[in-house]
Amino acid sequence: TLEELSPENCLFFDIETTGLSWKTSHLYLLGAVFYENETWIHRQWFCQKPGEEKEVLLAFSELLSTKKLLFHYNGTTFDVPYLMHKYTFYQLPAPWEGTRQLDLYQLFFPLKKILHLKHMRQKDLENATGLFREDLYSGGELIEVYKKYLLSGDEHLLEILCLHNKEDVEGMLKLLPLFSIRTLWTGNCQEFITCTHTVEGNLLLSVQPEHPFPVSFEKKLPHVVLRITPQKLLLEIRPEAGCKKFFYSNYKDYYYLPIEDEAIHKSVGAYVDKDHREKATPDNCCKKVNGCFYPQYEELSLRLSGMSVRKKTAGFFCRKILMKIRNNF
């Protein structure tokens, strides 16, 4: 709901641990970003020793109790299960009951192909949107840094540990503009679409985003070119001229005329010589249609094909493209 999405109800978090198994490792750092007094606040809880885990968990529970929406990046796979086991171990109630969770990794995964990403690490998405970190370490590499800090107390090592976590949680907040791209196939953007034609006769759909796109890129498919800039999306669609076949679903009500290679309704076909007609079948109960056709990337109830059998690559008329654009990209 809109109330849930208000900044005051949102909490972004990330954890750092000494290993992947909650049984053989411990939580050493938990970072969170939240909105308070009209500003975003970053807070961290650091464990100098394993015995301080419980205090960190209690502090996180207290903060989360005031929020309704919990953001994390791939936390469904690691952060949340890890913390759940820790809360159980310390006989503490789970803090996220009644709190909705949004995993940005799962929500943004469809962007991997569009943005030409090899991996879907948070850093990969950040780099694609022009964000670059000071932190040079991975979470795994920081385990040794943490151990060295415990032995030496070197404040520089502590800064390295805190910087990595800080950029993780603040990075999630900076990735939120990517939702403007995701809404192309999950939201209703038709009200922002204008339709024109190029000199060559190509259909040109222009989408003015409600919020600016955080990236610019171009993607080409057969017959289609997609161009995205911060202020506009342009979809240029090249039609294919030719003859297609429109298939009728109620083929039992039709006769097939072999010479014409198309079907006519029995109410009319009754006047055709019996030697020039036959009962229609699902594969020949059709009518030839001449015109310009636009590409179709999923099967519709409207059956148009350049072949005498149904195919998912069939074309469909221009009026259908606006209904399907958000699902095709």
Where are these predicted regions, by residue range?
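DEDD superfamily 3′-5′ metal-dependent exonuclease/proofreading module
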Residues: T1-F13, L20-S25, Y35-F329
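Short beta-strand scaffold segments in enzyme catalytic cores
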Residues: L30-A32
